[in-house]
Amino acid sequence: MAFDQDWVPKTRLGKLVVEGQVASMDEAIKSGLPIREPQIIDMLLPDLEDEVLDINMVQRMTDSGRRVKFRATVIVGNRNGYVGLGQAKDVQVGPAIRKAIDAAKLNITYIRRGCGSWECACGLPHTVPYEVTGKAGSVSVTLIPAPRGLGIAAGNTATKVLEKAGIKDVWTKTFGTTRSTLNFAKATYDALNQVNVVRLPVYYGKEEV
């Protein structure tokens, strides 16, 4: 993604990034400071990719009549653990997409990966480390560790979210109205976030001597 050379940071974290005191996303997250400027992500993750998942027209009745806006849902990620989901509305499609991209950047998080399938013992971070479930509205998505080489066994929307997070192999189980792209994407994103909720023992993944 292109970085805005004229950006003047307003937050403490933004100033630390420009000064070079925070040089990576890992350092930014560990600092405990909130990420409130999308330009921070542009600097720390220059290889970030974005993809529009859904554009929908929404209407609202007001005293002055019916108002129409476009709602855009966007996923961003570097295909190596960092992923974010965002949505925004605007009277035009272009601005709605740009706002959604900025929102996705501010929601970016690191997803822990591993080799959690009993059928595989490669030790590479190609799938989720254990089974997790995410929910959004009526949609429920369960991610199950898969052996290396299987690929992503999921619907189109979930596949886009998982690919941006760097997940290469995974089984999925879905329930509810998966035709709703927004809830399907949110449920998949929530499932990925559940990976970080579980606390693992310090010896997890280490061979016993």
Curated annotation (Swiss-Prot):
One MF term in the entry's GO annotations: structural constituent of ribosome
NCBIfam families xrefs: PRK04044.1 (NF003125), uS5_euk_arch (TIGR01020)
Family per record: Belongs to the universal ribosomal protein uS5 family.
InterPro entries listed in its UniProt record: Ribosomal_Su5_D2-typ_SF, Ribosomal_uS5, Ribosomal_uS5_arc, Ribosomal_uS5_C, Ribosomal_uS5_euk/arc, Ribosomal_uS5_N, Ribosomal_uS5_N_CS, Ribsml_uS5_D2-typ_fold_subgr
Organism: Methanosarcina acetivorans (strain ATCC 35395 / DSM 2834 / JCM 12185 / C2A)
One Pfam family named in its UniProt record: Ribosomal_S5
Protein name: Small ribosomal subunit protein uS5
Keywords from the named record: Ribonucleoprotein, Ribosomal protein, RNA-binding, rRNA-binding
Domain S5 DRBM residue range list: 48-111
